[in-house]
């Protein structure tokens, strides 16, 4: 699943450890973001290997307008004004006002809401958005304090803040990108399998509670806002997307971001920057790859071999 995220090296490893009798079923959307690392595995495979396109949207109701809206975008078309509705809202503002507007929208209805940004730095980046949202929404939450080598320390994360894990920890069943909420700071009743001291609890999006121990401290970050690469593969009831004139925001970025929403999309920025992002060719268009050529050559050899055997 989410095969558009598979890079060439990962796919090579998967193929290398299997036999010729193994069959792969790749499920993904080639219109979404290209893999972070090299290659365009799914993007090229669907142009060579027979594939099936699933065109019935399950994440959003057709009546919400979101499926039609995102179809326009993936075709490179700017949605017409009539396509904006109570489920798809553009909050037009200047770049300098984006952070304030995003924070106000989040505070008005934080439950089920995720802010998705293109970058960490900048006026619309997750760093400043997380800082501002914490100040406005949770300034009195208990700070996460701990002792290391006998010295007191603290993380700028407070009780009831949303958090995200940024590294895999297979021993604890945690994956990079797992979201949760920090709870019970200094009062955790949970213990790890090694009876380590728990500084707090983290309630995962699944409802499961896990103890926050020292070994996980460098693994968590604030998650009022997250980058799209962390959000890809996930879905949220409501998303807030700050939009600027940034080259990272291309057609596939906008399409991938907006399709994370289940019921409501709130775009913050100017219509001109939003339109430019839709018109900007996806980064995958500029990648130089060779997989398609190799696949076509292999298919041709296979076809010639079967023709020879038949004759």
Predicted regions and their residues:
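Walker B catalytic acidic pair
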Residues: 1-2, 28
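Conserved RecA-like ASCE ATPase "motif II neighborhood" in helicase/translocase motors
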Residues: 2-20, 226-229, 251, 255
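Short, well-ordered alpha-helix to beta-strand connector turns
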Residues: 3, 21, 49, 160, ...
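Short glycine-rich, flexible loops that bind phosphorylated cofactors or substrates
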Residues: 6, 172, 248
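Short amphipathic alpha-helical segments
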Residues: 10-13, 37-40, 127-130, 253-254, ...
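Short, solvent-exposed amphipathic alpha-helical segments in soluble enzyme
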Residues: 14-17, 130-135, 255-260, 282-283
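Conserved helicase motor core of P-loop NTPases
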Residues: 17-22, 27-172, 183-193, 198, ...
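C-terminal accessory regions
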Residues: 165-166, 176-311
